[in-house]
A protein has these predicted regions:
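Conserved, structured core segments of small domains
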Residues: 1-118
Length: 118
């Protein structure tokens, strides 16, 4: 099995566009999806990303920039760290995420490079 990082990208205001009922349903669907990944033994970690308080460290001098980091409305909303047989299996796991039913979303699928001892 190989490890993959699934990076979830949305537009910044999409969560506030959902009604309380829609948000509740989204959370239930997301919980079921995560539960399935855990049951299948493929989930290594997952978290949403806070929209505020981010910093960008750049260049060798360590200069800082407060969020947002670019002019795009697209933001990194969270990630999943999974294991899968190959990139195609990882893509299928990403495609099964119920977030696509609720809000405009993109999920990047990145193979992770193993390092010492992994």
């Amino acid at each position: 099995m190989k490890e993959y990082l699934l990076i979830i990208k949305t537009e910044g205001s999409v969560w506030t566009d959902l009604s309380p009922e829609e948000l509740q349903k989204h959370m239930e669907n997301g919980g079921a999806y995560i539960g399935g990944l855990m049951k299948d033994g493929v989930l290594k970690g997952a978290n949403p990303i806070e929209k505020s308080g981010s910093r960008l460290v750049s260049e060798q001098n360590g200069s800082l920039k407060d969020a947002p980091f670019n002019e795009s409305k697209e933001v990194v909303a969270g990630f999943f760290h999974i294991t899968a047989k190959d990139i195609n299996a990882a893509v299928e796991i990403a495609k099964a995420n119920p977030i696509f039913k609720d809000i405009p979303t993109k999920i990047e699928v990145h193979p992770m490079m193993p390092i010492g001892g992994n």
